Amino acid sequence: MMKRFYYLFVFLSFILFSSQKVYGQASFFDAHVSKYGELEQVLGDKWDKIDSLVVHGPINEDDFKIMWKCSFEGKLTVLNLEDTQIEGRKIPDCALFNYEKQDATISVHLNIRKIILPDNLEEIGKYAFMKMKLEEINFPQNLRKIGRAAFGNCHWFKTNPVIPEGVTELPARCFMNCQCFDKVTLPTSLKIISDDCFYNTRVAEVNFPEGLDSIGNGAFYASDLKIADLPNSITKIASLTFSMCDRLRYIHIPENGYIDYIPNYFAAYDDSLERVDIPNTIKKVGTCAFDSNHMLKDIKLPNGLTYIGQNAFYKCAFDSIVFPVSLEYLGGGSGAYWKHIKKIYSLAPTPPYCAEDLINRGKGPFHGLTPNNIPVYVPIGSGEKYREAFGWNYFTNIIETDKFPTGIVSPKMSNNELCKVYGKGNELVIEIPNLLSSPIHYSIYSIEGTMIEQGNLIKSYTLRMSAKGVYIVRVGNTTHKIFM
């Protein structure tokens, strides 16, 4: 009997000792403060033993510094601010980030994993939660502004952000290097996605709301984005926006009249990119804009395009391509390593200028695995010009034709021109200096190949055009490309 009581005494003593040890650690603390800057006093000597902290009452920047200390030098991992009144309704700049202590070493991340913010919060300051082991946080509905790099380098951030209505800008590096969320919901109020906002994130799905105005440099660089369907409201796109996106399959740039330039490195090194919608307003494709997109098999270059930059389509998988009549400049390497190309069409009667490759000196736009014996179709009367022009002389099978995929018929050329054709304001002028003894046939086409007018002339003629653009005018056996 005494032996049984002995074992019972030992067991109860162990339970009592263990309970005192657990509760003695003060792993949870409910802090009530009555004024700004009081948190340190309320926590007392327990500050470095607290794992979960709930704060009630008014807090300010000084109180956030204490919370940072509780985590960086203590054990704090969970922070509940739901019942606080934050000064100015703003999380202060660098609220839970200390540049000197955390940025000196790349591996130093604050141990806070969960934060609950109050409903009346209106602003999160710059660098507020940067470089933290944060996994979960709420975005209050009253939130209107988020500061630069507020969540930058929060690698473990797994909450799929739902940005509240009223937020108009996502600032530079806002979610840079966040590695664990895969979907972002953007509000209709959003106007700007700034530089490097989702740089090197695992975000795969983003809605681009109507009303969005601009997307900054590298905004989705090296992300897991699958589709970039840009809204009609977009007026600005930037360099590196969609580069290094291994899972990106489709980019839609709207036909809205605002965007006339595809920036440098816009969507380069995208291993899965299969389709890009380029609007007819585009006049220039920048350096390396679509460089090394090995799955991009087809692209429709817009009528009116004048410039293609260095390496713009380097190593793409085109089987054919049509260079529009408006094209004037082909950058070095822009058609290099097209190992799948079967035919090329160039609609310009004058060969577009071919620049030297800045990396492979002495070579032009076409080289490497681009076969030089494929048919290159050019307008009738321009074959010899192409054969003699640098860059185009890479090809050995240049063929004159008046049949092009766009439907434009390119008639025969002649050096014995009887007239002068030009644009003047919104008028197209066919000037015949001397009255002709017999009528001469003329025809006017849009750049898409649509017949606008035809007839016979013996004297000068002026036609008022309904829209600006590029027109093909045939008078007798001569062809003119006119920019209105």
Set out the residue ranges of the language-model regions:
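Consensus positions within tandem repeat domains that build extended binding/scaffold surfaces
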Residues: 95, 125-128, 147-152, 171-174, ...
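C-terminal outer-membrane/trafficking sorting elements
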Residues: 409-484
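Membrane-proximal C-terminal cap and juxtamembrane stalk of leucine-rich repeat ectodomains
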Residues: 366-407
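Structural signature of tandem-repeat unit edges
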Residues: 26-34, 51-59, 75-89, 102-123, ...
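Low-complexity, Pro/Thr/Ser/Gly/Ala-rich linker/spacer regions in secreted
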Residues: 22-28, 399-415
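The feature captures the LRR N-terminal capping module
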Residues: 23-45
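Bacterial Sec-dependent N-terminal signal peptides
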Residues: 1-27
